[in-house]
Amino acid sequence: MKNITTTEEFNSVIQSEQPGIVKFEAGWCPDCKAMDMWIDPIVDKYNDYKWYSVNRDELEDVASDNEVMGIPSLLIFENGQKQAHLHSANAKSPEQVESFLKETFNK
């Protein structure tokens, strides 16, 4: 998962025609650390998509502009548009994340 560190880089990444999955997180967030322990097999399973991470504290404007109110949150972008948003309340388990991705990508 590539870390995005600037607004410019974020804006460039989301313009792709291929869907990109962006995880918003923060270093102090216990749920984000928990997700880090189980997300790798899911990233591997959905490896035909590019995965990115954004520290919401470092890119607050990007998080705010994309209505990221809680973390961790997964957002899917394609052609510069947000296609789907898994809010933090529903991103607590591998099953919730898998269900979101299956529904979004019809896999």
Question: Each PLM stretch: what is its role?
Answer:
Residues 11-41:
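Local sequence-structure signature of Cys/Sec-based thiol-disulfide redox active-site neighborhoods
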Residues 30, 58, 92:
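Short alpha-helical
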Residues 11, 33-34, 65-66, 83, ...:
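Chalcogenol-based redox active-site neighborhoods
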Residues 78-107:
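Non-catalytic, surface beta->alpha helical segment in thiol-disulfide oxidoreductase systems
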Residues 1-20, 96-107:
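N-terminal leader/targeting and pre-domain segments
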Residues 4-5, 24, 40-43, 47-61:
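Thiol-based oxidoreductase modules, predominantly thioredoxin-like and allied folds used
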Residues 66-75:
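Structural micro-motif
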